Structure formats: structure tokens, C-alpha cells
Amino acid sequence: TPGETINASLKLLARNTSLISVKQIQIKGAKMLSSIVEKPLETNLSTAIQLSLKIQESTKFSNPYWLNESPSLGMYEVEDQRLIGLPESPPAVSAEVFLSIGDIQMSFDLPLVYRYAKPDKGELWERFKVVPPISVALSNDVVLFSDQSSKEVMVKVQSFAPNQKGEISLQLPKEWSVEPLTQSFNLSQEGKQVSFKFTVSPPERATE
């Protein structure tokens, strides 16, 4: 989340020469809290550089760039024209690594990735994302009411930061009713998820 401090590890490997040194590291999308000194790389020996980063408060949430603006009928709106044609949004946080190879100076960008493991799938990698403190989603994208019978609608709330609390309610068309009107949540732990059940009743006459 914006303003959060995270720890990252930059791993480098020189395959066939010992004349490579890391001169500098610049972080885009976050403030680097740790200092970096020039570090030579040893041949065929993995080198890990530990980084402490603070996500900038102004960092936007990770989202497909074509969904950042409200679309018109059949047309997406993209404010930054340089993004058009890219298959995905630029990484939220990336590192520009400056190297010296003998007498040659060069740099390259590395996106920050999240690495984790699942018992059934092994090691997985995905782009690091900046998310809001709270995520709210319906269990089903579509709920069909074929008659005037009430139906249950489940809403999932997940926290991405500790100590998140608030109230949740459903926005419905006029003449529709819901029980209860609101429900409260208090999520003390990061990553915790809870589900809430609402009973929605349609009106006697069909509406949209």
C-alpha cells in the first residue's frame, strides 16, 4: 500500500567475467532507505543486495492503464498517450542498476517482482502491485433474479494493511430492498479476509 515500507532483494550473477561492478542503484516508484556502495561481482557466484524501500504516498494503485479513466461507449480513454500499445502497465516499482564492465558503463531496468511458493504449483513469480488497504468483491459477478424471490449475495472484504475497519453496504436501484442495510468489519491482521451475507429482494415489478 502507499506509504508502506518493504524489504527487497536484488540478485545478480556474472557468468563469465569478474570485471563487473555494481556502481549505483536507483529506485523508481519508491524511496530507497538503505545505502548502496560499489560492489564487484564474482564470477559464477550469486550476489544478493538487500534493499529497504518505502512506497511513495503519491504512487497510484496498480491497474491496467486503459482502465484508469472511465471509458466511453466502445472506446477506452488513455491520458498518457505513450502507454498506448503496451501489453500491460509499467511496473509499479522498478530498479535501474548501473554497472561498470571494464571501462564500459551501462544500466538496465528490473521490475520488482513478488516471489512465493505453493505446494501444488511450486515457485511462482508475479509483478509487485500497489494496492489499497481494503479490497471488496462480490462472490459472484452476476446474480439473476428470475422472479420476486429473495436471494443471498455474498461480499468478500480483504485487508492488505493491519487495523482496517469500516462499514459495507449494497447500492441497489429504487424499490429494491436489502437486509441488513449495513454491516461492520474490523480486520486487525494484514491479509485477513471475511465474507458478509446480504439478502436482496427485488420489487414486485421488473426493473433494471
Predicted regions, residues:
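Beta-sheet-dominated interaction scaffolds and their linkers
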Residues: 1-4, 127-151
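Extracellular Ig-like/FN3 beta-sandwich strand-entry sites
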Residues: 5, 88-94, 150, 191-193, ...
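Short beta-strand elements
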Residues: 104-137
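Short structured motifs
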Residues: 9, 32-40, 78-83, 136-142, ...
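Short, solvent-exposed beta-strand/turn "edge" segments of beta-rich domains on protein surfaces
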Residues: 2-3, 40-44, 82-89, 142-147
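Short, surface-exposed loop/turn segments at beta-strand-coil junctions that are enriched for proline
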Residues: 41, 52-89, 102, 186-190, ...
